[in-house]
Amino acid sequence: MLYNLSTSLIKKVYTAFVVPTEREDPVAVGFDMYPQLLFCCGLIFGDFIKCYFLTVKILNNRWERIVPFRDYRYLERQNLHYMLQQRKITLAESEIPTHWYNIMADMPNKPLPPLHPGTQQPIDAEALAPLFPMELIKQEVSTEKWVEIPDEVRNLYSIWRPTPMFRAIGLEKALGTQSKIYYKYEGVSPAGSHKPNTAIPQAYYNAKEGIKKIATETGAGQWGSALSFACQLFGIECEVFMVKVSYEGKPYRKIMMNTWGATVHASPSNLTNAGRSILEKDPNSPGSLGIAISEAVEIAATHDDTKYSLGSVLNHVLMHQTIIGLEAQKQMEKAGDYPDIIVAPFGGGSNFAGIAFPFLQDKLTGGKNVRAIAVEPTSCPKLTRGVFRYDFGDTVGMTPLIPMYTLGHNFIPSPIHAGGLRYHGAGAIVSQLLKDGIIEAVAINQTECFEAGIVFA
């Protein structure tokens, strides 16, 4: 399962682990409790980012605090030079879920409605129609618990789904823990990430309405790659605004998007009023997802044959990703286990929602005491340091106002390697769940993530 660090440039594995320990020293071998752990955090081998390893201190059978896991040299001291012994849990194609799960149906407090950027009144479907196909608008506001996956979408999912789950037995031994560690691996998709889970249905619904072109943004290139792949399947033209710092630092992502027929621009660009306004203020702007969103939205809003597509944040996007967790539930049942903790990286919410929401259904309706922890970068800590309020989803202020934890739509994060996590706000659903104390959030430094990724590799 583990790919060669020097050669695999796009494969992405979602993994992380939590170590319950009695001591400050993360190599402690005495434990008060051994919860089963299921995780879905990110690691790109050869270009790796988003891997979050945490140490949890237990006192009096309580999870007292979460601190970064720093002591990796103990692996050498214990002469544990293997990390590959794992147990694979698979599903048949016939077990691909037939419906997406909409957590809105089970939330005790529904998110506040999005507001029109001009009137600041609740926005209606007519105002969203220039940007999205009607079926996605319906999904965005729906409170129906189960939304059927179209047969054509499900058939395309079968190109790579169901994705495998692994029990990281070698990692457990390396840590000296009796906790069970599982991870769901989404890197088997053609684009190398979880993003095609929503790119495919978004392209499908646009194609059904006769849309000829989709404009979008991308950070590190994962979403742009996924949508390029999906648009190619449905004969739709794809135009991608890629955050400049990633455009320059990750040229292979641009090549991948071009291979699937997409046109890719560095953002901010001189192609839009939004881009030009940013460059006038800062000709050397590294760009941000908020800026790239502004440019893509402008293209969609000014061209009748073009719609806009977003790879995270919005309700329908998060719902499409729940296919990950729905499969994981079946795989955990096959393994005879159930997770106590779920961990996932957090940029706008799609990865986290995908693995966590189906298990949170058990918490909201079935009394399961599962914990879901969103892990974000310290350079863009919207969940841990942001303010809950209405804010724009883009930098210029063209999108509807969304109720979210936000650092402010003008916030430009540091140009960290994890380009897909450089977003100022969180989706409305995730923000409401955090506000209600149903989920948790922590922030981790980039260097610690790199070190932890090397240990896992």
Model feature map: region roles:
Residues 86-210:
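Positively charged, low-complexity intrinsically disordered leader regions
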Residues 137, 146-182, 189, 201, ...:
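Metallocofactor- and cofactor-centric catalytic cores in central/energy metabolism, strongly enriched
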Residues 146-148, 278-280, 285-316, 324, ...:
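Active-site/ligand-binding loops adjacent to catalytic centers
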Residues 185-198, 214-224, 314-317, 343-348, ...:
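Active-site nucleophile and cofactor-binding loops and adjacent substrate-binding regions
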Residues 198, 209-245, 338-351, 372:
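A short, small-residue-rich loop immediately preceding and capping a beta-strand
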Residues 201-211, 225-237, 258-259, 356-366:
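Alpha-helix C-terminal capping segments
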Residues 223-286, 382-392:
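Active-site-proximal loop->helix
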